[in-house]
Regions:
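Positively charged, low-complexity nucleic-acid-binding target-recognition regions
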Residues: 2, 286, 290-428
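Phosphate-interacting basic helix/loop segments used at nucleotide- and nucleic-acid interfaces
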Residues: 163-170, 240-263
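Metal-dependent catalytic core segments for phosphate chemistry
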Residues: 192-233
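Acidic carboxylate diad motif detector
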Residues: 50-156
C-alpha cells in the first residue's frame, strides 16, 4: 500500500534560501518545457527528459539541481496536461496550461535516489543531494517495512517548509468482510455535519473565531502598500490565518472519517457533487466551509485502508423518500422532521435520509437479496424493506403524496419494524 507522511522541516536561513532558489529554478524549467510543448508537436515526457543533459550545458544553474528533480519537473508538466485532457473528455470546459509566475510553483520532488534519513547526532535530519542535511521534526516514525519512493519538499504560503514522504509497504489492505455485521448510512449537512443510522449526530465545526481573525487580518492587509515590507509581513499573517482554518478543519475531518472507517464494516454515503452544490445560489459559504468533498475522499481511502466496504449512492430523493414505505413527499428545508403522509412514519429529517442512504448502499454493493449469515440488525433492516418496490407511490392513499394528511387517511400502514428501529435510534 502507498501512504504519504508529512513532516515539518527546520532549515537554517542559508538552507531556506537555497531551497527557495531550487524551487524557483524548477519553476523556470517548467516554463521552459511548457513553451516547447506549445510550439512542438508529438512530444512526450520521456522524449523531453532526454533533452535535460544537453540543456545543462547551456544552462549552468541546472547543474546545481539533482537530475531526478529535473526529470520530475518535466513529468509534472505532462501529468498536468493529462489531467487537463481527462477533464475535457469528461465534458468540462478547460483552458490551457498556464505559465507559472513566482509564488505559483512551491515544491520539488526527489524520486528513487538523492535522499536519505539520518540520525547520527541524536536528531533526525534529511539529507538531500545538492542541498545537504536539513533538520526535521520527526514527530512520528515511518513503518518499519516502508520503502521511501519519493520525497517532496514544499514551502507553504506562510513561509514554512515541509517534506512529504511517499512510502510503499508490502502488505495488502485487509480483506473486506463478506457479510458485514455493522453497517451505517451517513447523511451530511451544515448544522449537523453527520447524522447516521445509529442516531449519532455530530455538530458542525465552529470556525467563527478563526474566520473573524482572518477577516481582520485581510482588512489590515488591504491598508498596506502593495509590495512593501509591511505588506509582505501582513500577507504572511493572512496566510497563517488561512492555515489555522485549514488545520482545524482537516483535523476534524480526519478524526471523524477515521472513526467511521474503523468502527463499521460497511459505510454508505451520498455521492455528492460538492463543486456543483457550492455554485448554487444562497448559503454557498457554509457549503464550501463544510468541505463535504474532502470528508468523503478521506472516508473512502480510509475505508479501503481498514478493509471497510464504502459505497456512494445517488443522493436524489433521499430526504423526500420515506424510509418506511418509500413514498416521496416534498418538505421545505426548514422542516426538520419527517412525517410520512402515507404510513404515518415520523423521524428526524436527517435520520430518515441516513436510512435511505443505507438502504440504497446495501442494494448497490451487496445486492437486493439477503444472505443467510447476515447480522440480526441487517436482517431487521431487510424485513422492513423487502416489501418495498422501486416505485415511489403507496398501495393506496386518500390524497396525493404532496398533501399533508393524517396517517389514518391512509390504507397502507408501512412497515413497523423499521419504524421502531429508527425511532429508537433517534431517541438515543
Amino acid at each position: 500500500m502507498n501512504y504519504n507522511y508529512r513532516y515539518r522541516l527546520r532549515p537554517s536561513d542559508a538552507l531556506a534560501e537555497q531551497l527557495a532558489w531550487t524551487v524557483d529554478t524548477c519553476r523556470q524549467v517548467y516554463n521552459h518545457f511548457l513553451h516547447r510543448l506549445n510550439r512542438t508537436d508529438d512530444t512526450s515526457a520521456y522524449s523531453e527528459q532526454k533533452l535535460l543533459p544537453s540543456l545543462k550545458k547551456r544552462w549552468n544553474d541546472l547543474k546545481q539541481v539533482h537530475s531526478k528533480v529535473l526529470q520530475k519537473v518535466v513529468q509534472r508538466l505532462y501529468d498536468n496536461l493529462s489531467t487537463l485532457r481527462g477533464r475535457k473528455e469528461n465534458g468540462y470546459r478547460v483552458g490551457t496550461l498556464k505559465w507559472k509566475a513566482p509564488g505559483e510553483y512551491r515544491s520539488f520532488t526527489y524520486s528513487q535516489s538523492g535522499f536519505k534519513l539520518k540520525n547520527t547526532s541524536g536528531r533526525t535530519k534529511l539529507w538531500l543531494s545538492k542541498l545537504g542535511e536539513i533538520p526535521i521534526t520527526f514527530h512520528r516514525d515511518l513503518p518499519d517495512d516502508a520503502e521511501i519512493k519519493t520525497v517532496t519538499v514544499k514551502q507553504e504560503p506562510t513561509g514554512e517548509w515541509y517534506v512529504i514522504f511517499g512510502v510503499e509497504t508490502p502488505e495488502d489492505p485487509p480483506e473486506k468482510p463478506e457479510n458485514p455485521e455493522k453497517c451505517v448510512g451517513i447523511d451530511v449537512g451544515i448544522l449537523k455535519y453527520t447524522h447516521d443510522t445509529y442516531g449519532t449526530a455530530v455538530e458542525s465545526l465552529d470556525l467563527s473565531d478563526e474566520r473573524e481573525r482572518l477577516e481582520r487580518a485581510q482588512r489590515d492587509l488591504s491598508r498596506k502598500e502593495h509590495g512593501s515590507a509591511n505588506w509582505e509581513k501582513q500577507r504572511r499573517i493572512v496566510a497563517e490565518r488561512h492555515a489555522d482554518l485549514k488545520r482545524k478543519r482537516r483535523d476534524f475531518l480526519h478524526k471523524l472519517s477515521n472513526y467511521y472507517a474503523r468502527e463499521y464494516d460497511f459505510v454508505a454515503v451520498e455521492d455528492l457533487d460538492a463543486k456543483g452544490l457550492v455554485e448554487l445560489p444562497g448559503n454557498s459559504r457554509n457549503r464550501a466551509g463544510a468541505a463535504w468533498g474532502m470528508f468523503l475522499r478521506m472516508l473512502e481511502y480510509k475505508c479501503e485502508r481498514d478493509g471497510t466496504h464504502f459505497v456512494a449512492v445517488n443522493p436524489r430523493g433521499t430526504t423526500k423518500e420515506c424510509a418506511s414505505c418509500g413514498v416521496s413527499s416534498d418538505k421545505p428545508l426548514w422542516v426538520r422532521e419527517h412525517s410520512c403522509p402515507a404510513c404515518g412514519f415520523e423521524a428526524d429529517r436527517d435520520a430518515n435520509a441516513a436510512w435511505n442512504i443505507l438502504s440504497r448502499g446495501i442494494k448497490k454493493r451487496l445486492g437486493a437479496g439477503r444472505s443467510e449469515s447476515t447480522s440480526p440488525e441487517i436482517e431487521d433492516f431487510w424485513c422492513a424493506n423487502e416489501s418495498r418496490s422501486d416505485s415511489s407511490t403507496p398501495v393506496e392513499t386518500a390524497l396525493s403524496v404532496d398533501t399533508s394528511v393524517s396517517a389514518k387517511r391512509v390504507v397502507e400502514a408501512g412497515s413497523p419494524t423499521l419504524k421502531e428501529r429508527t425511532a429508537s435510534a433517534v431517541s438515543e
